Every structure is written in structure tokens, then in C-alpha cells.
Regions:
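N-terminal beta-strand motif that seeds the catalytic metal site of vicinal oxygen chelate
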Residues: 1-18, 78
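Vicinal oxygen chelate
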Residues: 2-3, 91-130
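Short glycine-enriched loop/turn motifs at secondary-structure junctions
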Residues: 3-6, 71-75, 107-108
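Short aromatic/hydrophobic contact patches that present stacked aromatics
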Residues: 9-11, 43, 77-79, 113-115
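Core segments of cupin and vicinal oxygen chelate
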Residues: 13-57
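Short, conserved charged micro-motifs
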Residues: 19, 85-90
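Helix-adjacent hinge/juxtasegments
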Residues: 59, 68-72, 76, 81
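Acetyl-CoA-dependent GNAT
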Residues: 60-65, 128-130
Length: 130
């Protein structure tokens, strides 16, 4: 039996923190948490209940001139669950933004699934129950 209640943070390294922040705020509606810490990490709230630790994506800036990632990246993708109505609207919005939207299937869960890349090249899955 698991003792874990929730995953609360996904931390992403960013060459362009501002563009990545804008992507998650505008595309997925994530909310900025706290005060700006320049330079430093940006915390974006994904979800949460008042009595619990919020679920967050943390954007950590790489030093200027870092260039391409030199080692294999361990993050395959991150996934957001949305409602079926939100899924349809989000798919339209992503295409209108000119982003490449890729389809997919989940191996275990009957669902509708799409994939898109954030400005850093991280793959983001959007999934809803079929």
C-alpha cells in the first residue's frame, strides 16, 4: 500500500524561463504562486486543496549561454488530466497557436490523448476519460 498522497512538484530546467512560463499560464491556465524571485525558480500552481500542499510545476532557469542539454534527459513527458469539454477546446486552441498536436493512446486507461511540446521541448500529454 502506498504512503504517498500526491505528486506535488515537477521541476523543469529552462533556457527561456519567460517563454516557458507564458506557455503554461496561457495554454493550461496555471497560476503563478508567490513573488518573483529574480533570478530564480518560478512556481506555477497546477491544482490543490487548501488543506494540502498544492501541485506545482517549478521552472528553474539555466545559466545564460547553457545551450542545448548535453546529457540524456530523464523526463519523458508530463501529463494533465482535463474534462472532455476542456479537451476539445484545448485541442482547438493548441492548433490555432500553430503548435504541432500529436495523437496517442493510453495503454491502460480508456481515454482521449494528445501530445504537444512546450518551448523547452518537453512533451506535455493532455488526457481525458473516453
Amino acid at each position: 500500500m502506498t504512503i504517498v498522497q500526491s505528486i506535488v512538484e515537477i521541476v523543469l530546467n529552462c533556457r527561456d524561463q519567460a517563454a516557458t512560463r507564458t506557455f503554461y499560464e496561457e495554454v493550461f491556465g496555471l497560476e503563478f504562486m508567490g513573488k518573483p524571485m529574480e533570478p530564480g525558480p518560478v512556481f506555477l500552481k497546477v491544482a490543490g486543496q487548501p488543506e494540502r500542499v498544492p501541485q506545482m510545476i517549478v521552472l528553474v532557469p539555466l545559466p545564460p549561454g547553457s545551450g542545448e542539454f548535453t546529457s540524456p534527459r530523464s523526463l519523458h513527458h508530463l501529463a494533465f488530466e482535463v474534462t472532455p469539454d476542456t479537451y476539445d477546446q484545448l485541442e482547438r486552441d493548441l492548433r490555432e497557436r500553430g503548435l504541432e498536436v500529436r495523437g496517442g493512446t493510453h495503454p491502460l486507461v480508456p481515454s482521449r490523448t494528445l501530445y504537444v511540446d512546450d518551448p523547452e521541448g518537453n512533451e506535455v500529454e493532455v488526457i481525458c476519460r473516453a
